[in-house]
Each structure stands twice: as C-alpha cells, then as structure tokens.
Amino acid sequence: MAKRTDIKKIMVIGSGPIVIGQAAEFDYAGTQACLALKEEGYQVVLVNSNPATIMTDKEVADKVYIEPLTLAFVSRILRKERPDALLPTLGGQTGLNMAMELSKAGILQELGVELLGTTLSAIDQAEDRDLFKQLMKELGEPIPESEIVTTVEAAIGFANAIGYPVIVRPAFTLGGTGGGICSNEEVLRDIVENGLKLSPVTQCLIERSIAGFKEIEYEVMRDAADNALVVCSMENFDPVGIHTGDSIVFAPTQTLSDVENQLLRDASLRIIRALKIEGGCNVQLALDPNSFSYYVIEVNPRVSRSSALASKATGYPIAKIAAKIAVGLRLDDMLNPVTGTTYAMFEPALDYVVAKLPRFPFDKFERGERRLGTQMKATGEVMAIGRRIEECLLKACRSLEIGVHHNELKGLDTISDHELVAHIVRAQDDRLFYLSEALRRGYSIEELAGLTKIDLFFLDKLRHIVELEQDLIKKPVDIDLLIEAKRYGFSDQKIAELWQTDAASIRRLRRAYRVLPVYKMVDTCAAEFDSQTPYFYSTYEWENESIKSEKESVIVLGSGPIRIGQGVEFDYATVHSVKAIQAAGYEAIIMNSNPETVSTDFSISDKLYFEPLTFEEVMNVIELEQPKGVILQFGGQTAINLAEQLTKAGVPILGTQLEDLDCAEDRELFEKALKELGIPQPPGKTATNEAEALEAARAIGFPVLVRPSYVLGGRAMEIVENENDLRSYMKTAVKASPEHPVLIDSYILGKECEVDAISDGQSVLIPGIMEHIERAGVHSGDSMAVYPPQHLSKQVQDKIVDYTKRLAIGLNCIGMMNIQFVIQNEQVYVIEVNPRASRTVPFLSKVTNIPMAQVATKLILGQTLKDLGYQDGLYPESSLVHIKAPVFSFAKLAKVDSLLGPEMKSTGEVMGSDLTLEKALYKAFEASYLHMPEYGTIVFTIADDHKSEALILARRFSAIGYQIMATEGTAAFFADQGLDSQLVGKIGDNAHDIPALLRKGQIQAIINTVGTKRVTDKDGQMIRSSAIEQGVPLFTALDTAVAMLRVLESRTFSIEAI
C-alpha cells in the first residue's frame, strides 16, 4: 500500500512541559516523527508549549507553534492552519487527551480533520477502563477482576466483595497519577476520593491486586495491512505493584521460558490487532511465576516511555516508523534505517542485554515519600548495554550520578539487620542497594525472594557480584581475576578499593596487560547482516567493531539522566553543538547514558557511545578515538565535574579552560577576579566547619544565603535567619560536597535577572537579558522569566551589559556563560557565574532566533563572532513579550513541600509569547496548568513580613469580583486596614478548614507565604499539599500572584457606580 496522497498537511501535538511520568522521551518521539513526515513530503504543523525541546525548533516542522496545549488555543491553530489530519500519538497522554477533547467538542468534525495512527475508538478502548475490560473479555484475554466506580461507596462495596489488597487506577491520567495499592478501607477511601477528582471522566478502576506477579512489557507495531511485529520484550526486575517507570527493567526478557514468551507475545499481537492501532503500542502483562496464567495489565495506544527505551535498546526507530505507518506506508515497504538492507518488518534480535535504572529526585527532596507504588516518582532514567546482566547493571549504577560507582551505597554497612530487612520489604527508590548489602551480609537469595517476590535469577546475579568482590579481596593483583571483574562490569575505582590502591594504578595495570574494552555495535540483527549504524557500547571481549575514522573528531559529553536542576535543556544544547561540529567539517561523537533523549538517537551524531559519563569510561573512548578535543560546556554539571581529571590526564578541553572554570566555581578566586574587574557582589565568606560559619555570618549580618560550592540546581541552598538555623544547616547539609567549603553570602532582597552570553575571548554577544518575576531568593529555575525585561532602567541594563563583557573577557570565556544578577536601588550585584550553557539556552535561542549553542560551538572551534556576522554587545530586542514559566510535579511527590526557595523544585517549563506582558503571562499560566477563573474565592494566609504587601493584592482581587477569605492573623490585619474578609479555619476546624473547602471545590486559589524565618509550619504545609492534591492554583511567592492578578485585571472590565 503506498503512502497517502489525499492528505497534504498534518498537525502533530507535542507533550507539553516535562513532568514526572512524561519526560524527554516525547521530544525524541516528536522530533523523529516530524522529520519522518517531512521526509515523505508532507507539510507538518507542530504545536507544543515546551520551548526546551528540539521538536520546537524551526527546522523540525514547517510551522511551529509554541502555545498552550488547551482546547481554546489548539482549536484556534486548527482553524488557522486547516490541516487535513492530526497525529496525536506522539505527544504522550497530553496529546491523546487533547485529541479526545477536540473530538468531543466537535472541532475535528467541523473542520474535517482526520485522526491518524490511532482511532478515537481505540484510544477510548485502551484508556476507558470499562471499554478496555469489555474488549479483553471479547478477545478472551484474562484481566484481574475489577469494577469501574464513580463514587467512594461503590469502591468500598466492591473491595469488600473481592477482598483486600486492591489497586486503584483513575481513568485518563498519566504516570499512574492518583492511583495506589490499598490494604484497608481507610486508605481506599482517601485514594478513591482523590482519584475521582483527578480523572477527567470521574472514573476509577478498582481491581484485585496481583502485586508479586512478574511484570512483562511488549513493544509492538502494526500497519494498515495488519502486519504486526514485536520490536522488543522487556522484563521488570521489580514485580507488579511498582510503576514500570520506577522499576529496574531488562531487555530482552530474561526469566521467561519459550512457552511463556510465545504466550505473552501472541496476546500482545492479538491486542494491537483488535484495537486496529496503526503505529506503535505498548502492552503490559502480569505473569504468575508459578503457573502459565497471566493477566493483561494495561495498553498504551501510543508511543510511550517504554518505546523510547525499546528504540534505544534495539536500534529500531519506533516513532519514525509509527509516523510513516500513520500515513499509509507498510512495514514490508520500509527499509530498516539501521541496516539499510533489511525491511522494517524484521523483528530485532539482540546479542546483548540492556538495563534501565530510574533516576529519582530524592537527593533534592530528602523529606519526600520514597516508598514506591503504582504512581510514578522518577524524573528520568539511564540505560546501559552489556553482554551480561551484572555488567549492564553496574554500568547503569555508575550512570545514575548519585555518587555511587557500584551497586553499593555509602553508610549501609552500619545499619541494623532489622532496618535492612524493613527497607527490603517496603520497596523504596534505593532498594537495589539494600538487597546488595543483604547479600554481602550472607542472606540467602531464597530469603530475599520470599521478602520481595523478585525472581531468583536476578538475585543470583546480585549474589555473583558479591562473590566476585570477595574473590578480589582474597587475591589482590591477580590479572585473571581483574579480567573477570571487568567482564562483569566492575569499575577501576571499585577494584582499587578492594585492592586498597587507587583507580589510577588499576588503570595503569590494565593498560600494561592490555586489559582494554572493545566497542560493539547496536545493529538490530545480532550481527547477522552488515549494519550502517555508528552506535556502540563497551564490553571486555576480543573484537572491536568501532573503527577510528580518518576525519578529525570532536567528542561532546551529554548530560546524563534527567533530574531536577538538569533537564532536557542541556540535551537541546548538546544536539545543537553536534550540528555545528559537523558543519565545521569534523566528525561529531556523542557520549551519553540517557535513553529518552534526542542526543542518543544514533542518526544525530556521526558516532554515539552509550556509556556512563565517568572518568574511566570517557577516557576509554578518548584513547580509542584520539579526538581533537572534548567539549564539556553543554553537559551541565555532569560534564563540568570531569574537567579537572580530564585536564590532568592531558585531554584537550575545547572552550573555557580548567583554571577559568575553577575561577568561576572557587569562591576565593572568584572574589579576587571580581575585585580586579571592579564588579560588586553581595558580601560573602567561606567556611569549612560550624565555628567558621557562625563567625562569617556574624560578620556579614543575618539573613544569609548558604550553599555548598560546585552544585547545580541550588542543591542544599538555604536562606538562614539566625544562629540556630545555621548550626542545623551545617550539621545536615554540608555533606553535599565535603572537599569544597560552604559559601555564606549576605542575602539581598531585590530584583533578580540573568544573562546568557557567548564569547570568543575578544568580543561578547549578549542575546538577551531575562528579568525574573519572583524576587531574589527563589531559584532562577523556579522563577518566571520575562524577555525583553519590562522593569529595568536603561542605566541598569547598561551596567548589566558592561559587567557581562568584563566577566566574559576577564574569565577568558570561550563559548557560553550564564550570569545571575540581583538589583537593589538601581545597584547591580553579581550573584553567580556559570561558565557553561545554562537551562535558559533553548528559551533564549527560540525568542531571539540566535542558535546559541551552535554559535558557541563555532567559537569553541576557532571562529570569531565577527566571522559569524554578530556584533559585540546586547542583541536588538524582539517586539513580542516572551515568558518562560516553571512547571512542577508536586502532585506526584507526597511529602515534598511546594514552598519556593533557593533550592530548585520544578521539573519542566513552558513558554507564553504575545504582544503585551499580560497576554504573554496569561498564555504562560494556561500552558503551565495554572488556570484561574474570572471570579471566585481566594484565600490569603500570609506571614507577618508580607501582610502590608498582601493587603494591596487583596484589595485588587476584591475589586475584580473575588471574594476574600483569610486565616485568623491575616483576616485581623485586613480588618484593621478596613478590608472585610471571611474568616477561614486553618487546619482541624472540621467542615470549615481550608482542606475541607478545597475538597468541596469552594476555593479557586490560595496565596500562602512563609516569613523569612521559613519555619516548617505543619499547618502551612498541609494547606499547600491540599491545594496541590485538588489542583487549585497555589502561590507561595507574592510576585507570581501579582503577575496572575495583572492577567485577571486585563481580562475583566471595571464596574464603578457614578
């Protein structure tokens, strides 16, 4: 069947901001799909609200709209563009839900827009719990006994009938939002009440819990001619009961017999055929370990997180093929782009094992609820490839970047057996490390299998790692054993610890005996056919398949797993840097460990090494490739942290050099440089212990801002008001980086702004100045940023430009640099300088039309700004107003306080652009799911420091028709000032406290601030978490509330009596 000629223009819906459960995998899928459709000659219109993505680059689609993904905006774009068809299956749950909304509102029918890939009935059958149940019955596929409920009472009735535990799954939600396992009525009542609110159709499925079964996934493809195949099978290390996004996953499946594999494979193919999906689909099944009985858990009728993993694990480009199937091409028409000779109808065969480990945000949120269940909590993931399970598991552990280089966590050897077992029984994000510790203490794998229901096969692999550790201790400097340990994935560092030496000596020993890794190709066909892909992984075997090319090469280090503080923005910069390296005539080589991203798509670079970003692994690749140099600027803190070791090893670092990186990161050197350059900064000192810290704070005067040096995303940063708080900070937080001292600065409450600059060493281009809406003290990644600035005087802007130039030249910056300023009484202070690409690069590149990472790379490779046609200084401003707004994932993270402060908490971002500030703000709020109606009730619960400021806000809210409610102290203050408000009980005042009113839907927004003391007030935290659970807009910074007020005021007419 040929591709369709009756459609010319296709609209693709992106997945919006990155939240837990929906991360960079959709940027990868969307980019692949848009390029595939363009390749086939279609006109592509893309809509997405997330500027930090490659898919929203102008080259990816014919027309790109960065607008809110709401019914109002998407239907306007549809009316304007009049596409023939809509492809919603590449935008995750957001894309599917948008297609459903457009269809239900009658817009698709009115405009004659056809849905491609998955029909509405298939989306309904897979997503609507009732229809799914019916379809499975018709197919004779077993599913756990279940009932759809729309009330809490019905849920309790059904649970009593089948017995606890039961699982709750709300319909049409993402990443298991609102779901959970309930072992009694009390828990069930809470979860269902919340789940019904979160489900857009007010439905929950209550089903028998099959926790403890093996969880298996199949990634399947089908075309319009009913050809179907399995691209990849995957097995979760953790049994059913833990969300697959939070599970350790191996591909292909490891513990299934041939019969079991065929059974589940056939079921998956039957399901995709019954749903008539044209494209990709993910089927999750539960297998009873003791019999051949299985259950179908769920079906995702779209490209998903697992498809990104399956694509990278096999090399088979699922999203690209799915997009082509959607326009009528068949699997047996399309060549497999990996081999270039076999067809896409060919099922991939793997001669290696892949491990995926989730990356959790609990290094940032130490107080968060770490227990795992059916609701996803990981922000990102890493993947590692090896010939053996032990090898890929240990490589994946090193890739996580949580300070471990082995399946071993510092400090676990000192905990009691009781505590150890408690951690193993209750699955947490770090259970793998507790299991490994138990095996080191001599627990048997049978005991652990009994406690966890994890298959003995996997536990035996962990035991084998422990046995190798013991052998290494017994036989120091045994070369045969060294080879054995390397084959099973041990790092030089771990072997060095066991042999009581250092990693450098192990490296020398390995090289002396020629114990070196070889690189194998990922080729989809287990080396049966010749392959064209330059996609490699390391292993300790004989034949090396990665041949150094004749061309001079440059290696770019990626940024590893997505976590809070280091998101998809850095991947964006990496991909752009590669484009510039290729344009300059070099071979571009990427090293990265994240399966979700565009940078690890093998068609992006000339060579891709899927490896942990550690010194050992990076050096191995450098020794093989002998590149011109390595670029670290675009890999976030991950890459910058390797600068020192690489420089010492004699590796040429391209761009800003180590001593200049140090000058920006090392406190004393930085102060000295600023003095020499005549640039003011807030008074500050360094301290290495509690006594020094107290002395420093007394000299500077409270409040002070304290933080460790060399960190990203404001990790462990706090505003401290008094000596007691400082003592407790020094006790708990300084473990963040022991070799580096703690920085103590005077905290200046002023306006914050930031600049990204690009320098060639002689002249400096400043694409734009971004002004933050929230005042200093809120992390820049959590602030709304406005470009061009709206409230900075010409004099202040000139000063910012002058200081930026002085810093870039003074610190010998070649490439990118990010500087943050605070402004108080027209005085400009520098708060920090990062000599690398920052998270604002994609946003600024989009709004100024300067491909910043590409320009920076060209300068790093020796060109000048003048060569590229750019002037020195500030680039002319755009005529539109653009806003970058943060998006948070608090709804997924129980017990994490949503109060904004100097530690970053947002997971993603959106952009709003329009002719006026108010319109741009409106779009940014809509895109970040902060919708406020034009009237309603708003609650004020305000700290003493902010009451007079809040009074002005309350009066303005009242003037546009909002009813004002306030807690006791705030209401009393308002009354004294002549403003009436309705008193509301804080917590525990039964039917009239804030959580109760929130549950009844009687509150439309809450403004809750905490004084500079930032005392952890239990009440405030409960109010904040209730607002998040109920999806009610919550403002913890008055400046954000003022911004929202501007929007509401601009939308309402004033009514005054004459």
Curated annotation (Swiss-Prot):
Residues 1-401 are annotated as: Carboxyphosphate synthetic domain. Mn(2+) 1 binds at Q284, E298. Residues 402-546 are annotated as: Oligomerization domain. Residues 547-929 are annotated as: Carbamoyl phosphate synthetic domain. Binds 4 Mg(2+) or Mn(2+) ions per subunit. Its cofactor is Mg(2+); Mn(2+). Mg(2+) 1 binds at Q284, E298. The keyword Metal-binding applies. This is Carbamoyl phosphate synthase large chain. The lineage of its organism: Bacteria, Bacillati, Bacillota, Bacilli, Lactobacillales. The gene is carB.
